[in-house]
Design a protein with these regions (language model features):
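Non-catalytic cap/lid and distal C-terminal segments of serine-dependent acyl enzymes
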Residues: 1-263
Length: 263
């Protein structure tokens, strides 16, 4: 791809201290496969005690997407240097989870929720000593990652205090979709949304950020979900960006969200 200049230069590498990226590999008992995630640690501070954001990519991508095309680590380095945010860590997992079914492997995006809660969060937080409690933990994702985020935070509101839904969906448009769900399940009944009926739902989260591009191919679905958000009385920060279903929207989404959380 061609690297175009960034107007605010937040996604461009500058001569400042930079954080580190570490690739972690583990054998998952849930997917029965070797899995991986990337950990970003900010520069010049110990990892112990830091807040951590669990950040998910979209359909067809992988755990490297947020730091290659997304430039998330560069954006955070620059925001930290500018004093716009307090340092926090990132954990970026492969959300295209492949489940072994006989001799074949099939996509099962739903497994990520269990893998995060039962394997990735305990493993990462034990090793790096960040997070450790709801107040120091958030989750965000783009497109498919927004589906995984919404399902996870609705099922486990006790684990996260910050939520980012980029080009995002609160309904799962993958499970049971013959074009996307390789597992071949029946359409999902969106049972996770019942969590939003809890009178205390808004008290669970400091930030509930939902956004999309004004030329996104899924904009109509996003607007439909406005009504669900309003009906359930969810307190959200909502923003429409110029652009489509691509990184020209997701980088600004992430940049803005990073300045809202862990304050």
């Amino acid at each position: 791809y061609i690297e175009l200049p960034d107007e605010k230069k937040l996604a461009e590498i500058r001569d400042i201290p930079h954080g580190t990226l570490t690739h972690e590999f583990y054998k998952s008992e849930i997917s029965n496969n070797w899995e991986r995630f990337i950990v970003y640690l900010p520069p010049c501070v110990p990892s112990a005690g830091l807040p951590v954001l669990y950040l998910q990519h979209g359909f067809g991508e992988s755990e490297i997407s947020w730091t290659t095309t997304g430039k998330a680590n560069i954006i955070l380095d620059n925001l930290i240097e500018m004093g716009k945010i307090k340092p926090f860590a990132l954990v970026m997992s492969d959300g295209m989870v492949q489940e072994k079914v006989g001799s074949e492997e099939r996509l099962n995006h739903v497994l990520l929720e269990r893998m995060l809660v039962e394997e990735i969060i305990p493993m990462a937080e034990k090793k790096y000593q960040f997070g450790g409690c709801k107040e120091k933990r958030g989750m965000a994702g783009l497109s498919m990652g927004s589906v995984q985020t919404t399902r996870t935070i609705c099922d486990h509101p006790d684990l996260f205090s910050e939520v980012g839904i980029f080009s995002g969906f609160i309904r799962d448009n993958i499970e049971g979709n013959p074009d996307r769900d390789a597992v071949g399940r029946k359409p999902y009944e969106q049972t996770h949304l019942k969590a939003m009926d809890d009178p205390d739902f808004n008290n669970y989260f400091h930030t509930f950020f939902r956004c999309i591009g004004d030329n996104d191919c899924f904009l109509s679905r996003f607007l439909e979900e406005d009504a669900i958000i309003q009906e359930k009385g969810v307190h959200e920060i909502r923003k429409i960006y110029p652009g489509g279903h691509d990184w020209n929207v997701w980088r600004p989404c992430f940049t803005d969200f990073a300045q809202m959380i862990f304050r």
